[in-house]
Amino acid sequence: MDNLDLIADEVRKCQKCKLWKFRKNAVPGEGNSKAEIMFIGEAPGENEDIEGKPFVGVAGKLLTRLINEILGLSREDVFITNLVKCRPPNNRDPEEDEILACSPYLTRQIESIRPHIIITLGRHSTSYLFKKMNMKMESIGKVRGKFYTWNIYGYKILVFPTYHPAAALYNPPIRKVLEEDFRKVKEALSSKPITLDNFLYGSGDKGEKGNSNSGK
């Protein structure tokens, strides 16, 4: 099993795609190596590129508040990372070749941590994991707010898509939905394992209808 520090060192030295030419710092991710909850975003932004840490800008502050105030946890209790570990120029969307080159690091992180719940933030990380689960990705607004079961590495991970915090910064309705989604995760965490099935909708569920905003 990979050590997270080893993976992080590889990420910082990585030149597998063109993004290394533009970065100040690669951003491997950080948090608890035995976290029950893992957050996966899209890619680092300007602040993350400067500091080499995930979600430290304005969107990151919102994520931290949601973790603290709704989940009742600290950033040190969870693990936070991105699908792509280097900042795309001008914060553009990651390109397919960049995702292909970088995603093996994420796969190894998931295998090392073995979280109980993965919260995908926005359409890019959600789409990537849905492909891994052999599921069709609709808009983030349609699939968010539900748990999907991913049987991988010989055990079960619950994947929970929601909006990227950046999509909620200047959109009060999306922020409200994001907060509601975090409350669902809190409720699941507070439930006994036998009742957790109440929150599972399985791979056949397409998610409730919602705002079709890209949600980052």
From Swiss-Prot:
CDD domains: UDG-F4_TTUDGA_SPO1dp_like. This is Type-4 uracil-DNA glycosylase. Belongs to the uracil-DNA glycosylase (UDG) superfamily. Type 4 (UDGa) family. GO terms for molecular function: 4 iron, 4 sulfur cluster binding; metal ion binding; uracil DNA N-glycosylase activity. InterPro entries: Type-4_UDG (IPR053423), UDG_Type-4/5 (IPR051536), Ura-DNA_glyco_family4 (IPR005273), Uracil-DNA_glycosylase-like (IPR005122), Uracil-DNA_glycosylase-like_sf (IPR036895). Interacts with the sliding clamp PCNA3 subunit. It comes from the Archaea. Optimum temperature is 65 degrees Celsius. Keywords: 4Fe-4S, DNA damage, DNA repair, Hydrolase, Iron, Iron-sulfur, Metal-binding. Signal peptide: none annotated. SMART domains: UDG, UreE_C. Its EC number is 3.2.2.27. It holds the Pfam family UDG. It is an enzyme of class 3 (hydrolase). [4Fe-4S] cluster binds at residues 14, 17, 86, 102. GO terms for biological process: DNA repair. Coiled coil: none annotated. It catalyses: Hydrolyzes single-stranded DNA or mismatched double-stranded DNA and polynucleotides, releasing free uracil. Removes uracil bases that are present in DNA as a result of either deamination of cytosine or misincorporation of dUMP instead of dTMP. Can remove uracil from double-stranded DNA containing either a U/G or U/A base pair as well as from single-stranded DNA.
